[in-house]
Structure formats: structure tokens, C-alpha cells
Amino acid sequence: FGNQQQLKSVADIVINHR
């Protein structure tokens, strides 16, 4: 399942954007 990795990437970007 590569969905978890994508979700982690999105979360990382969101955290970085904050």
C-alpha cells in the first residue's frame, strides 16, 4: 500500500507550510 507514504508526504508538506 503506497497510500500511507503519500499521506505522510502530504502531512509533511502541510506541517512545513505552517
From Swiss-Prot:
Binds 3 Ca(2+) ions per subunit. Keywords: Calcium, Carbohydrate metabolism, Glycosidase, Hydrolase, Metal-binding. Ca(2+) binds at residue 16. It catalyses: Endohydrolysis of (1->4)-alpha-D-glucosidic linkages in polysaccharides containing three or more (1->4)-alpha-linked D-glucose units. Its EC number is 3.2.1.1. One of its GO terms (molecular function) is metal ion binding. It comes from the Eukaryota. Its cofactor is Ca(2+). Monomer. Belongs to the glycosyl hydrolase 13 family. This is Alpha-amylase.
